[in-house]
């Protein structure tokens, strides 16, 4: 009750209570008002304590891994800059330290161009050989353990390996029962350091994912049954060992468990979050999957599922078709560094776009 209302109320009461021999009615009325104010203060304090208790509970649950606090970062990244000087770039990878960016080019001299973290070129990679034109680098990945650089080559049908200084080390030519006839394309490393490779050799029935360990020429195992994939391109492996494959000609993102069993997928379509021609795939440190949809001229972003059988939830997409900043003309590869900076090869615009949250 406002002070003015209390004053008006008191004016209607007698100053003395004749029945009590001098007890002040005014004093009694003030005491009631003070009690009301005290009760309001106590109620406010209790409300504050309840809010603090809820906040503390949320923090405890987040630290225990039961229920993460909501992210304060924006839903989608924004355009930062572009790296120019590469002929129709296809694949991109970033070293674990973030100080080297590797970009494959599919035209011109067909080099793997090496940039520092600021986007300045510091070198190139090219396999040895007499015929300088007989090589076509496509995808690239960097070992999280050795920082060696792995490059798939469509013409040589192998994976070229370089050390961090750029020295050529060897070629991986899949051999043995599983590796015979393989044609390497997409590359990624798993949490245990194994190399994952999409294989597009032969007919569609032979397209699959091969897993190599320790630089061996012979695959440890294959993922996917006959006919499961149709020209699988880029792929990424999450911390649990689940594999996300850009199954390009099938127009879907296929998600496999570590044993190679198909769990769920995002299909081709025209609805929100549907795909058309997925190529590059990357996973960041915040539980998000990024899929380059080449003919849609966008990068789609999804929330990783808790189980491989669940379909990733669609967050949104970034990029549009065009030649301006933040626009794509047939993007292909994607990589994310340790701080969350995103690199996308913008093939027909001859550049690598840089995005971040």
Predicted regions span which residues?
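A short helix->beta-strand "capping" segment at the edge of beta-propeller domains
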Residues: 67-86
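A short beta-strand motif characteristic of beta-propeller blades
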Residues: 78-84, 121-131, 168-177, 218-225, ...
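Beta-rich, blade/repeat-based domains predominating
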Residues: 85-97, 130-145, 177-194, 226-240, ...
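Conserved beta-propeller blade signature
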Residues: 100-102, 148-150, 194-196, 242-244, ...
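Short loop/turn segments immediately following the C-termini of beta-strands
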Residues: 106-107, 154, 200-202, 248, ...
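A short loop-to-beta-strand structural motif that recurs across blades of beta-propeller domains
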Residues: 110-113, 157-161, 207-211, 252-255, ...
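Short loop/turn segments that connect beta-strands within beta-propeller blades
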Residues: 116-120, 163-167, 213-217, 257-261, ...
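Blade-level signature of beta-propeller repeat domains, shared across WD40, Kelch, NHL, RCC1
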Residues: 329-357
